[in-house]
């Protein structure tokens, strides 16, 4: 696919967002190296927010809104604070200031600043930046996927028996499903083991899990109960790296559906989907 902008300033948008993300990364690194952070909980004790999350989102939204009038924003902390998700055709920035806040709180260096750009409800660009390891992933529709400027490619493995999967227990889903969720999650992982999967890994961040698939380190990833800001940016990085992103049922991916499956190949994705007990969520928009 050849890059075909659908807005005359689309490249300007992305270039400026990269500048802001790097600036935000300096803020995150400084806080990561500090002895402690103020931590609050949101929906449960697994849903954390720090003052750094809030400061990064403020920096990104203020910087982008000052430069680009009329743009819309969907930010994790803004929504947690009561902002309504407005999913329109206008240029819309979908932002997770720190994906992997629990990792950040515990000083585990697997975190990501995530910024996705949608125009006319199509994800056009994604930036995923781990400021601790200084790894910046970037993709634009039709331009390919890159890590620190170098092209990345998803695995071509088609077999679960040769695959390493990213998957967690998804304890946040107990808020909606109660203890039934533990049975679902354990059944899903057991089915994958019985199908012969080589191993499981979980990096504590949806975005990090997805870019691991994009760069071919892992072969697949599935998650239920995530949000648009977790997956908007990394979803285009996976597809531009040659991978596939779908609903866990195999139907087309909807960034607002609160669930995702990605894989290096469609064949492995289909086999992974067949291992799952599927659940639904109220769409975010």
From Swiss-Prot:
Binding positions (Mg(2+) 2): 96, 99, 230
Binding-site residues, substrate: 76, 98-101, 204-206, 223, 230
Keywords, comma-separated and alphabetical: Cytoplasm, Hydrolase, Lithium, Magnesium, Metal-binding
Effect listed in the UniProt record for changing residue 216 to E: In nj40; induces defects in thermotaxis
Name by which UniProt lists this protein: Inositol monophosphatase ttx-7
Reactions catalysed according to its record: a myo-inositol phosphate + H2O = myo-inositol + phosphate; alpha-D-galactose 1-phosphate + H2O = D-galactose + phosphate
Any Pfam family: Inositol_P
Family the UniProt entry places it in: Belongs to the inositol monophosphatase superfamily.
A GO cellular component annotation in the UniProt record: cytoplasm
Obligatory cofactor(s): Mg(2+)
GO biological process: chemotaxis; inositol biosynthetic process; inositol metabolic process; phosphatidylinositol phosphate biosynthetic process; protein localization; protein localization to synapse; signal transduction; thermotaxis
Organism listed in the record: Caenorhabditis elegans
Enzyme Commission number(s): 3.1.3.25, 3.1.3.94
Disruption phenotype annotation: Worms lacking ttx-7 display defects in thermotaxis behavior and localization of synaptic proteins in RIA neurons yet appear morphologically normal.
């Amino acid at each position: 696919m050849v890059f075909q902008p659908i807005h005359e300033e689309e490249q300007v948008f992305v270039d400026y967002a990269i500048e802001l993300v790097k600036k935000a990364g300096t803020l995150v690194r400084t806080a990561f190296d500090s002895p402690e952070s103020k931590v609050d909980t949101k929906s449960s004790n697994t849903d954390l927010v720090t003052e750094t999350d809030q400061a990064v989102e403020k920096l990104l939204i203020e910087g982008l809104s000052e430069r680009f009038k009329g743009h819309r924003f969907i930010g994790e902390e803004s929504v947690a604070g009561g902002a309504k998700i407005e999913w329109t055709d206008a240029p819309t920035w979908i932002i997770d200031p720190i994906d992997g806040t629990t990792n950040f709180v515990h000083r585990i260096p697997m975190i990501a600043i995530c910024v996705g750009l949608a125009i006319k409800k199509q994800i056009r660009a994604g930036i995923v930046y781990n400021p601790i390891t200084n790894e910046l992933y970037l993709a634009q529709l039709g331009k390919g996927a890159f890590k620190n400027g170098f092209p990345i490619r998803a695995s071509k493995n088609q077999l679960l028996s040769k695959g390493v999967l990213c998957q967690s227990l998804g304890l946040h889903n107990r808020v909606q499903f109660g203890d039934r969720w533990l049975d679902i999650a354990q059944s899903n992982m057991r089915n994958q083991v019985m199908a012969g999967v080589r191993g499981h890994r979980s990096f504590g961040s949806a975005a990090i899990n997805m870019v691991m698939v994009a760069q071919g380190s892992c072969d697949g990833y599935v998650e239920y109960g995530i949000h648009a800001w977790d997956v908007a940016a990394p979803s285009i990085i996976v597809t531009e790296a040659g991978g596939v992103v779908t609903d866990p049922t195999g139907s087309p991916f909807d960034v607002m559906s609160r669930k995702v499956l990605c894989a290096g190949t469609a064949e492995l994705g289909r086999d992974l989907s067949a291992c799952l007990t599927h659940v639904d969520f109220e769409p975010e928009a």
